[in-house]
């Protein structure tokens, strides 16, 4: 699963996920893309689960790019532990997603195959997504 190799600090504050994606919002590598329409957090497990669904559907054809990376640690206290005594340990990593962010890209397959693969992947994700095709000249 995806997670950072090293971090300057193990724990991070919660923060707020606001605004729209200004970078990483266009199809840059492949011919087709899966774009986020809503905002939220995608865990490393969800990103990997969607990738597997797409890979299995397109079989040996095509190429997939993952345009997001889970770099934010989410900490959690153990079960039945009293409040206080500091912040819990990092449990998993998430990618903060804003509307307009390109999640995955695909190339080397037909549009019908790509559309179906992205539909299967979108079912694994907790945010609304759209299928997009690369614009001519970009």
From Swiss-Prot:
<dbReference type="InterPro" id="IPR036920">
    <property type="entry name" value="Ribosomal_uL16_sf"/>
</dbReference>
<keyword id="KW-0694">RNA-binding</keyword>
<feature type="region of interest" description="Disordered">
    <location>
        <begin position="1"/>
        <end position="24"/>
    </location>
</feature>
<dbReference type="GO" id="GO:0019843">
    <property type="term" value="F:rRNA binding"/>
</dbReference>
<comment type="similarity">
    <text>Belongs to the universal ribosomal protein uL16 family.</text>
</comment>
<feature type="compositionally biased region" description="Basic residues">
    <location>
        <begin position="1"/>
        <end position="13"/>
    </location>
</feature>
<dbReference type="GO" id="GO:0000049">
    <property type="term" value="F:tRNA binding"/>
</dbReference>
<keyword id="KW-0699">rRNA-binding</keyword>
<dbReference type="GO" id="GO:0006412">
    <property type="term" value="P:translation"/>
</dbReference>
<dbReference type="InterPro" id="IPR016180">
    <property type="entry name" value="Ribosomal_uL16_dom"/>
</dbReference>
<keyword id="KW-0820">tRNA-binding</keyword>
<keyword id="KW-0689">Ribosomal protein</keyword>
<comment type="subunit">
    <text>Part of the 50S ribosomal subunit.</text>
</comment>
<dbReference type="GO" id="GO:0003735">
    <property type="term" value="F:structural constituent of ribosome"/>
</dbReference>
<dbReference type="InterPro" id="IPR047873">
    <property type="entry name" value="Ribosomal_uL16"/>
</dbReference>
<keyword id="KW-0687">Ribonucleoprotein</keyword>
<dbReference type="GO" id="GO:0022625">
    <property type="term" value="C:cytosolic large ribosomal subunit"/>
</dbReference>
<protein>
    <recommendedName>
        <fullName>Large ribosomal subunit protein uL16</fullName>
    </recommendedName>
</protein>
<dbReference type="InterPro" id="IPR000114">
    <property type="entry name" value="Ribosomal_uL16_bact-type"/>
</dbReference>
<dbReference type="InterPro" id="IPR020798">
    <property type="entry name" value="Ribosomal_uL16_CS"/>
</dbReference>
<comment type="function">
    <text>Binds 23S rRNA and is also seen to make contacts with the A and possibly P site tRNAs.</text>
</comment>
<dbReference type="Pfam" id="PF00252">
    <property type="entry name" value="Ribosomal_L16"/>
</dbReference>
């Amino acid at each position: 699963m995806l997670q950072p190799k090293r971090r300057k600090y193990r724990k991070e504050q919660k923060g707020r996920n606001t605004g729209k994606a200004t970078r990483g919002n266009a199809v840059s590598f492949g011919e087709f893309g899966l774009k986020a329409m809503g905002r939220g957090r995608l865990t490393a497990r969800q990103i990997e689960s969607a990738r597997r669904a797409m890979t299995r559907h397109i079989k040996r054809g095509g190429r997939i790019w993952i345009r997001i990376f889970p770099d934010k640690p989410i900490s959690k206290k153990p079960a039945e532990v009293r409040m206080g005594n500091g912040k819990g340990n990092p449990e998993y990593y998430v990618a903060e997603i804003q509307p307009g962010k390109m999640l995955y890209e695909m190339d080397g397959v037909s549009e019908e195959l790509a559309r179906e693969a992205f539909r299967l992947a979108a079912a694994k994700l907790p945010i609304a997504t759209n299928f997009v095709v690369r614009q001519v000249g970009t």
